[in-house]
Amino acid sequence: MSEKKIALITGATSGIGESTSFELANQFSLIICGRNKDKLYELSNELSKKTNVKTLEFDVRDKEDVREKISSLSDDWKNIDILINNAGNAHGLDFIHEGKISDWDMMIDTNVKGLLYVSKYVLDIMIENNRGHIVNIGSIAGKEVYPKGNIYCASKFAVDAISNGMRIDLNKHNIKVSQINPGLVETNFSMVRFKNDRERSNSVYAGLNPLVGDDIAKVISYVINCPENVNISDITVLAKSQASSTVLNRK
């Protein structure tokens, strides 16, 4: 195996995670993580043309599976330099009194607890090595609450607080912590949120020139390739057509 640094990416099989995998493939050996075994296999085959690839199949919500899979990494793979906490989702867009508890559980379990589970077991490695860089994918929804965003916004506000807490607690261990907060990004995000309602999903991006996964992947690459003494702690990325969570210039 080459001397490239190792980057672990959660939610690697679609959207921002998939774009980031391809963006980083020329520079890093990659551990790609996701729930879909077939998609992981297909992505691994493509990425292996450019770099060394290891796949870990797990659901970030399952803390025992997360622990087991990360603990199973061989000596060649266990010294993770970069963690991209990308796995996340939104479910529903409802007034809080009309929301579904199952949707709330999915968002909190994935966006908050899942991020914590993966971070916990990777940090055991990074602290031992006295180095590392964690990049948490937040959201503009973690900076501004918008109508019907309630629980999704809460989950991303939690990511914001966790990122800040990590940066403080891990400073003495020589570990950088960055957070990237995208605005509207045209991925499968809205299809998941609206339960595969394509018409409703498409309406989110109608009349806009939104960000795409590759845009955020380039920002991630920039953040992790800054000089060793530079830590970009927090960055919000919007399309030109988006001024805030609710102010959009539709054509």
Regions found by a protein language model. Give the residues of each.
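Residue(s) in the substrate-gating loop at a strand-loop-helix junction
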Residues: 139
